[in-house]
Amino acid sequence: CLFNDILDLSEMESGTLEFVREKVNLYHACLEEYDRHRLKVNKGVILILDDVDEELCVMGDRMRIMQVLMNLLSNAAKFTPTGEIHFGYQLRGNIVQFYVKDTGIGIPANRVAKIFERFGKINNFAQGTGLGLTVSRMLVERMGGRIWVRSGEGIGTTFFFTLPLG
């Protein structure tokens, strides 16, 4: 929602956005996002929550982690007319690496570097505000992680983000 994105952006920039630090079971958070998105994908698209460690937890803000996942899954659904969207996470040392991988249209090479900027859209026809990835980047960074993308036009896109365990 445009209003929520603008509000979150404003609060992050002013330093007033509050984060709750709690133990978050990542499997339950991902399963909730799976349930939210599985009926929203286009006909001919399969949403898959990959095999993950069902016991893995991080100390973080559950709502903000889910907000990032929701933004990434919504974008994947928007730009995947047919095919698959996989998502999940893996433990890598003392960090957790999340991913959302689609077989969609991909991001043109000249747009990849700007995708996390405000109002960064992959094309002029894309629906949405162009703020979701900016907000996601800021949320991930405020939680001590980082976010990046790999994409090939016509072959799909994979977004990654990391969060520290503790």
Predicted regions and their residues:
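Coiled-coil phosphoacceptor/dimerization helix of two-component systems
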Residues: 1-9, 29
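Helix-loop junction within the histidine kinase core
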Residues: 10-21
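A conserved beta-strand-to-alpha-helix junction within the catalytic ATP-binding
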Residues: 20-35, 66, 97
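Short helix-loop "hinge" at the ATP-lid/N-box region of the Bergerat-fold HATPase_c
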Residues: 76-77
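Short conserved segment of the HATPase_c
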Residues: 107-119, 159
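Short alpha-helical Gxxx[C/S/T] motif in the catalytic ATP-binding
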Residues: 132, 136
